[in-house]
Amino acid sequence: MKASDTVGRQTATRSVWESRALKNESGLLALMREAVRNSTTVCVLSGANTWRSRWVKYEIARAVIEERGLLAIQVDDVEPNRATPERPGLNPLHVMGLYQHENGHYYLVERHEVVKDLSTGALGFEWRLYADHPEPLVPPRYVGDIEMGRAAPLSLFTAEHDFLTEDGATNMAAWIDDAAAQVGR
C-alpha cells in the first residue's frame, strides 16, 4: 500500500507522547510500537528541538532495525500561531548513524554534545554507541558504504525535505512512497 492510498492517518501531538512518558515508560513504548505497527516508513517531522528527543531517536533506531524506510521533513516554520518561525533544528537523522566496526558488524550510534574547548566553552559532537540498542544489526538496503572504524549519519543515506518550500501538502505522500521503495516496500 502506498502512502498516497492511505486514508485517515493517525497522528499524535507531542503532549500525548510526553504525558505517556511521564506516567509510564513501558506504556509509552507500547503506544509507539502500536502507532507504527505495519508501517513501511518512518517520517520524522523535524522541529527546532526534535533531534534532542529520546523517543524520536528510539523510533529512528526501530526503523533502521526493522528495515523500514526513513526520511525527515523540516516543519519548523509550519506552526500557524507562531509570529516568527523557530530556527530550524538539526535533522534528527544527522545525529543518529551507523558505525562499522573493524569486525565488519554494524552498530547504531548517536551524536552527543560535548565541550570541545574548555577555555571557550565551545561545543561539538562525538559519536557514541546507541544505548537502547547496543547489539550489531544488518543495515537497511538504502545504507551505502561506511568505512570500517567509522560512523556515518543516517542523513547521508536518507532524504530530507522542507514542508513549506517543497510544497509538503502536495508532495509528502510521494516522499514517503520513495522512502518505502528504498527498502523494497
List each language-model region with its residue ranges:
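Inter-motif core of Ras-like GTPase G domains
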Residues: S39-V44
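C-terminal interaction surface of TIR/SEFIR-family domains
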Residues: N81-R185
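A short helix->loop->beta-strand "cap" motif at the edges of active sites that frequently abuts
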Residues: E66-L70
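Conserved TIR/SEFIR loop-to-helix hotspot centered on a Trp-containing motif
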Residues: N49-I65, N81-P85
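Generic beta-sheet signal
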Residues: I73-V75
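Conserved nucleotide-binding/hydrolysis micro-motifs of P-loop NTPases
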Residues: D77-E79
